[in-house]
Curated annotation (Swiss-Prot):
CDD domains: AAA, Bac_DnaA_C. Plays an essential role in the initiation and regulation of chromosomal replication. ATP-DnaA binds to the origin of replication (oriC) to initiate formation of the DNA replication initiation complex once per cell cycle. Binds the DnaA box (a 9 base pair repeat at the origin) and separates the double-stranded (ds)DNA. Forms a right-handed helical filament on oriC DNA; dsDNA binds to the exterior of the filament while single-stranded (ss)DNA is stabiized in the filament's interior. Residues 326-447 are annotated as: Domain IV, binds dsDNA. Disulfide bonds: none annotated. Belongs to the DnaA family. NCBIfam families: DnaA (TIGR00362), PRK14086.1 (NF010686). Residues 97-107 have a biased composition (Polar residues). ATP binds at residues 153, 155-157. GO terms for biological process: DNA replication initiation; regulation of DNA replication. It comes from Oceanobacillus iheyensis (strain DSM 14371 / CIP 107618 / JCM 11309 / KCTC 3954 / HTE831). This is Chromosomal replication initiator protein DnaA. Domain I is involved in oligomerization and binding regulators, domain II is flexibile and of varying length in different bacteria, domain III forms the AAA+ region, while domain IV binds dsDNA.
Length: 447
C-alpha cells in the first residue's frame, strides 16, 4: 500500500462485507485513517460516542481485516477530530525544502468540518455569525479584536475555525493560527525552560490572524498574561486580526489583568446563547443530511425538545438514536428515540433555582433577614452573605447581571461583578468557604 488512505479504504471494503449496511454506515463509513505510528493505526471517528462504540464493539474485527490487508498485525487507536492537533504534533517532521521561511510559523490546526457553510444560524448566534463573517471578509478592518463568549458546545470554536478557513481560502498566503490558551501557556512555559523565549515570540508575533480559544484559562497566570499582553500589542499594532473566545465576557473573568481586559474590549464583544427549538431542529437536520441519515420529523422534534443545552449534546443524541436503531435492528421512530435516550434524559427536569430561593437559603445559613439583602447596610455580617448570594445567583441561574442587581435592592450590575470576583478569589484559598458554598449548592439543588 502506498499510503494509509489506500490501506484504510481496502480495509473498509472488507469490513463492509462482514456487517449489515446500517451498521457499516453508522459506525465506519465516516471514519478516516489519520496516521500510522509504528504498529498503531490512528483512526478518527466523527464523535465521542462513535469512537467509544468502535473501541468496544469493532476493535477485533478491524484488527482481523487489517491483518488480511497488510499481512501484519496492527494495533488501532480511535480518536475524534479535536484530538488531531496532538497527533499532528507527534508526527515526525518532513525534511524541509529550501525556503526563506525561518521555521517559526506555527501550524494553523483548523478543523475542516468547521466552516461558515456548516454553521447553522439561529436567534442565539445570528449576531456572532455576522460579526465573524465581517471579520473574515476584512481582517483587522471590521472589529479587532473580536471577542466571542458563551457556554460550552454552542459554536464559538466552530465560528473561529470558520473565520480561519475563510481567510485562508481567499488569501492562501495568509498566516492563520488557531490554538487554545492552554496550548499557548504550555508552549510559553516550555520556551522558558528551553531558553527559547525569542523563538516563541517570533512564532506568534509574525502571523496575520490569531484565533485563541478559551482565553479565561490564562486568568491568574501572571507570566502568561504578561506574554499574551505583548503578543496582543505586537499583532494589533501591525493591524493583524485577533479573535478571542471565552465562556464569559472580559469583565466577568476573575483575576484577569485590567490592561488585558481593556484591550479585549477595544473591538466587538458578542455572545452566543443556547439555540431555540427551531434552531435545534435545523441543526439536527443539517447533521442528518451531512451523515446521509433519513430521520423522521417526529424524531427530530422529540430530540430537539429533550436536549436544549448545547449543540454537542444535541448531535450526540442524534448519533445515539441512530446507533441504538442499528443495534436493535429497528426502524427509527419517537418510541425508539425515547428508549435510546432514556439514560441521558432525566425522567423529570430539575426544578429551576431562583434568586429568592438562594436568598432564603443564604439568609438561613448566615442568620440574617431576607430584607437585609436589599438594605444599604455595609457591615460585614450583612455584606458578606449578600456577596455570597450574588455569587450563587450568577453561578446557578440564567439571570442577567442587571436582573441580579435588581433583586438585591436595585444595585448596579458592577456590584454583582465585584461580588462574584471577590468570592471567586476567596474560594481559591479558603477551603472552609469552599465547603460552605458546596453545601449551599447542594441544598438549593435538593429543594
Amino acid at each position: 500500500m502506498e499510503n494509509i488512505e489506500e490501506l484504510w479504504s481496502a480495509t473498509l471494503k472488507k469490513i463492509e462485507e462482514k456487517l449489515s449496511k446500517p451498521s457499516f454506515d453508522t459506525w465506519l463509513k465516516n471514519t478516516k485513517a489519520e496516521a500510522l505510528e509504528k504498529d498503531t493505526l490512528i483512526i478518527s471517528a466523527p464523535n465521542e460516542f462513535a469512537r467509544d462504540w468502535l473501541e468496544n464493539q469493532y476493535t477485533n474485527l478491524i484488527s482481523q481485516m487489517l491483518l488480511e490487508v497488510t499481512g501484519s498485525e496492527l494495533n488501532t487507536k480511535f480518536i475524534i477530530p479535536d484530538s488531531l492537533e496532538e497527533i499532528e504534533e507527534q508526527k515526525p517532521m518532513p525534511k524541509p525544502k529550501q525556503s526563506t521561511d525561518t521555521g517559526d510559523s506555527p501550524k494553523s490546526m483548523l478543523n475542516s468540518k468547521y466552516t461558515f457553510d456548516t454553521f447553522v444560524i439561529g436567534a442565539g448566534n445570528r449576531f456572532a455569525h455576522a460579526a465573524s463573517l465581517a471579520v473574515a471578509e476584512a481582517p483587522a478592518k471590521a472589529y479587532n479584536p473580536l471577542f466571542i463568549y458563551g457556554g460550552v458546545g454552542l459554536g464559538k470554536t466552530h465560528l473561529m475555525h470558520a473565520i480561519g478557513h475563510y481567510v485562508r481560502d481567499h488569501n492562501p498566503n495568509a498566516k492563520v493560527v488557531y490554538l487554545t490558551s492552554e496550548k499557548f501557556t504550555n508552549e510559553f512555559i516550555n520556551a522558558i525552560m528551553d531558553n527559547k523565549s525569542n523563538h516563541f515570540r517570533n512564532k506568534y508575533r509574525n502571523i496575520d490572524v490569531l484565533l485563541i480559544d478559551d482565553i479565561q484559562f490564562i486568568a491568574g497566570k501572571e507570566s502568561t498574561q504578561e506574554e499574551f499582553f505583548h503578543t496582543f500589542n505586537a499583532l494589533h499594532g501591525e493591524s493583524k486580526q485577533i479573535i478571542i473566545s471565552s465562556d464569559r465576557p472580559p469583565k466577568e473573568i476573575p483575576t484577569l489583568e485590567d490592561r488585558l481586559r481593556s484591550r479585549f474590549e477595544w473591538g466587538l464583544i458578542t455572545d452566543i446563547t443556547p439555540p431555540d427549538l427551531e434552531t435545534r431542529i435545523a441543526i439536527l437536520n443539517k447533521k442528518a443530511k451531512a451523515e446521509g441519515l433519513d430521520i423522521p420529523n417526529e424524531v427530530m422534534l422529540y430530540i430537539a425538545n429533550q436536549i436544549n443545552t448545547n449543540i454537542r449534546e444535541l448531535e450526540g443524541a442524534l448519533i445515539r438514536v441512530v446507533a441504538y436503531s442499528s443495534l436493535v435492528n429497528q426502524d427509527i421512530d419517537a418510541s425508539l428515540a425515547a428508549d435510546a435516550l432514556k439514560d441521558i434524559i432525566p425522567s423529570s427536569k430539575p426544578k429551576e433555582i431562583t434568586i429568592p430561593a438562594i436568598q432564603e437559603i443564604v439568609a438561613e445559613r448566615y442568620h440574617i433577614r431576607l430584607e437585609d439583602f436589599a438594605a444599604k447596610k455595609r457591615t460585614k455580617s450583612i455584606a458578606f452573605p449578600r456577596q455570597i448570594a450574588m455569587y450563587l445567583s450568577r453561578e446557578l441561574t440564567d439571570a442577567s447581571l442587571p436582573k441580579i442587581g435588581e433583586e438585591f435592592g436595585g444595585r448596579d450590575h458592577t456590584t454583582v461583578i465585584h461580588a462574584h470576583e471577590k468570592i471567586s478569589k476567596m474560594l481559591e484559598q479558603d477551603t472552609e468557604l469552599d465547603r460552605d458554598i458546596e453545601e449551599l449548592k447542594e441544598k438549593l439543588k435538593s429543594i
